[in-house]
Amino acid sequence: MKSRLSWMVTLLLVLALVSGFVGCAKKAEEAVIAEPEPTGPVTIEFWHAMTGKNAENVQLLADQFNATQQKYIVTPVFKGSYSDTMNAGIAAFRANQAPHIIQVYEVGTATMMAAKGAVKPVHQLMKDFGQKFDPTIYIPTITSYYSTSKGEMLSLPFNSSTSVMYYNKDAFRKAGLDPEKPPVTWPEFFEMAKKLKASGMEGGFTTNWISWIQLENFSAWHNQAFGTKANGFEGLDTELVFNTPLTLKHFETIAQLAKDKVFIYGGRENKANPLFSSGQVGLHFESIGGYANFKNTCKFDFGVARLPYYPDAPGAPQNTIIGGASLWVFEGKTKFEYKGIADFFSFLSKPESQAQWHQNTGYLPITTAAYELTKSQGFYDKNPGPEVAIKQLLNKAPTPNSMGIRFGNFNIIREIEDQVWEDILGGKISVKDGLAKMVSEGNAKLREFEQLNK
């Protein structure tokens, strides 16, 4: 009941966002009015969803920017999970109380793009307020997610990530496995997971983000279409098509291993992290953005490796796709506030700022210069994990199946997939019927979004 209520609240808020933005957008644009010079520092409110070490590093960036000048004060405000933060931003905008900057996860990109007049495009912001802005300094695989077909960036990539495999090297040793040879293929992975379970662990493996990692990235890594129209990049009239024989085999294997207690389900989003950090399982799938927190919480030696692949899948491994979030700017602010936001975004894009953020958190560097600076500093010699993620993301030139995903109502679609996955584990529905249900109910949400944005 709780998940159904959450799903309904999210649906109503997203519908309110897209339809309500139309009515509020003109008023918001007109709200950028001339005002007298501020008598003190201008506060820039920055809503985010970061926790733990990542939240500390958000605050660090704000503090560092604030120390460079006296005109603006960037104030980070934690608003809960990604979905909580997005929903809070929707509600705040409709109440004319929107923050200046909001962190929105990648599944909300299509919704934000459709909200014309409610958000101020980053490329326009930087141009209007005198910032040197060169889109080519950013890594294309990342920025394409947040840009128009003309290459115009609508939001600033911030905590970009991709999914990787974490493994407990100490547990590998105990199970008689080579700690320097993590599994490369899925058949190898499942056999190692069974050995970890047999060695005395509570389970062999777990995973976060069932949709993002085991459906979306799984499809991209195997060069399979997740949806039509280049996964939504080429039009709103797209459909989900991920219920392939390969995906069916993959999910049936995991479902069976759940019955055998080799796979342990830890919950939605990133709720499975404690199963790995506490040593209950030896293998785990999570964002590279979890690297800093694992470094802080794991009391054992762990490694980072690429996602496994099925060797009989043509073209695999391909490349993974990004997750994480970008920073969007709301309309309706003063010119002084926009100048402060533009200055802050320029600060965030500096190689030194990006390299620090990347090295402290594990999130991907969004600029080539930050990556090169990190390499020159010898960071990867002692911390190879984050570079595994970068090389995996850039493994091959993206195809229409692996360039990313851009669907409307995608946060709702993910909630549908989470619920069906839990029903599969609970024995309420077969894997085959469950995947079909994910696709059919997800496609219904795509049609709703398409009708609303014709």
Regions found by a protein language model. Name each.
Residues Q64-P140, K174-G176, V184, G282-L283, ...:
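Extracytoplasmic "Venus flytrap"/periplasmic binding protein-like
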Residues I321, G385-E441:
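C-terminal capping/gating helix-and-loop segments adjacent to ligand/active sites or protein-protein/ligand interfaces
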Residues S147-F158, S163, R173, P187-E239, ...:
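Extracytoplasmic/periplasmic solute-binding protein
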Residues F190-L196, G235-G266:
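Glycine-centered hinge/linker elements that transmit conformational signals in sensory
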Residues D63, A67-T68, T75, A91, ...:
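Extracytoplasmic/periplasmic substrate-recognition and gating elements
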Residues E37, H123-Y138, P182, Q224-K249, ...:
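Short, solvent-exposed loop/beta-turn-alpha elements that line the ligand-binding surface or hinge
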Residues A91-A92, P99-H100, Q131-A171, G203, ...:
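A structural signal for short loop-to-beta-strand junctions that line the ligand-binding cleft
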Residues Y105-V164, F190, E216-W221, G303-R306, ...:
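Hinge/lid segment of periplasmic solute-binding proteins
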